[in-house]
Amino acid sequence: MLTLDTLNVMLAVSEEGLIEEMIIALLASPQLAVFFEKFPRLKAAITDDVPRWREALRSRLKDARVPPELTEEVMCYQQSQLLSTPQFIVQLPQILDLLHRLNSPWAEQARQLVDANSTITSALHTLFLQRWRLSLIVQATTLNQQLLEEEREQLLSEVQERMTLSGQLEPILADNNTAAGRLWDMSAGQLKRGDYQLIVKYGEFLNEQPELKRLAEQLGRSREAKSIPRNDAQMETFRTMVREPATVPEQVDGLQQSDDILRLLPPELATLGITELEYEFYRRLVEKQLLTYRLHGESWREKMIERPVVHKDYDEQPRGPFIVCVDTSGSMGGFNEQCAKAFCLALMRIALAENRRCYIMLFSTEIVRYELSGPQGIEQAIRFLSQQFRGGTDLASCFRAIMERLQSREWFDADAVVISDFIAQRLPDDVTSKVKELQRVHQHRFHAVAMSAHGKPGIMRIFDHIWRFDTGMRSRLLRRWRR
């Protein structure tokens, strides 16, 4: 069967112009105009989707099939083009019957044209084919427009669903244009209104806990620039003043035992005049035990040394992905669970804004994984937020899972974040030593988000930084009172 793309080529119908007209009409629709005004950040993201729409429409037109009646009429037209005028005159009755049988729009006009002329000339033959071609072009254009209209309605329905989803989540997850673009890409999944309302719920909870939100922002910004030593750094001359003992005495600095007759103390010199003590004086002189003044001098001189330029380059430390481990034990239920989930939502917001990855692992008796920054990030976030915290605590398995993930090249610059109350058994020595090795050799950083003031110090000592958010009733009341 003839495809619409082939028909357009045969009749020189410009499908590109039809596609552009449809896209312009779609972007100018009142629904999108109101949405763009309300959410300007998402306008650029939707506009970036236009090439994908254009390609999808081209593919739809290319694969569309032409109705059998139109296909048969086109075949007849092509055969008629090959006929000479005498042959055309012979075939004309069959052509007119075929057009009538196919209910062609050209059938009635063709018969009127033939009836109006008693003689079929070469000019009439050419005119007949030209008008027939125009009729076929009109039919092909109409078919293109019908298909594009169907696609427009379907595309508009899809865009409206995604706009509803993105509009609800934009205040929660989109902090800049980058985040808005990634949020729009994530909205392509099959989601219902009741699904993403869970994200809205935890977003509202996060807004009610500004200290928790601020804590997540501080953790996200915690990797700063530092000076990086270079093997090929240039050497610089460094001048410094050095103090050295002088050979010429300058001042009395104290007393000492020596044989220096010139600096004897008067009492020692007096013993020399006493006969009974004269031999004692000589003995102490030989043994260098006479009390004398200690004279000391010092001088300063400039010393020049060469050293590498260690502060020549300041390389911004890359803000890598987040690997977040969340404790789902029974002690983390209730308000702790709400805070942990809201904190992960805040990290997801930071990851979207800074084009980072956010990988969540839930640890209790088993490890459950979610990637909140991937193409299915919204669906993954909904599944994560739907989890219940009622397992046990296996912190060692959590660290082993983190270390296994950090071995991968794509996670070599990741920051590990552990959210827990840290009421657990001590870590095995092999886990502790491996974590320290990652910190020392690979500069991986481990952050603790402590949800309790009663976490074990022996466990928390392993972390580079501890971010405390006490969820006890007293702390909650104090935070509410300060607001």
Curated annotation (Swiss-Prot):
- Quote the protein name from its UniProt record: Regulatory protein ViaA
Q: Which domain of life is it from?
A: Bacteria
What gene makes this protein? viaA
Q: InterPro entries of this UniProt entry? A: Uncharacterised_CoxE, Uncharacterised_ViaA, VWF_A, vWFA_dom_sf
Q: Whom does it interact with, and what assembly results?
A: Homodimer. Interacts with RavA.
Coarse class of the protein's main subcellular location: cytoplasm
Record key words, sorted: Chaperone, Cytoplasm
Q: Where in the cell is it found?
A: Cytoplasm
HAMAP family named among the record's database cross-references: ViaA
Q: Please provide, in alphabetical order, the Gene Ontology terms of the cellular component aspect for this entry.
A: cytosol
User: What this chain does, per the record?
Assistant: Component of the RavA-ViaA chaperone complex, which may act on the membrane to optimize the function of some of the respiratory chains. ViaA stimulates the ATPase activity of RavA.
| NCBIfam families assigned to the protein according to its UniProt record, in alphabetical order | PRK10997.1
Q: Which family does it belong to?
A: Belongs to the ViaA family.
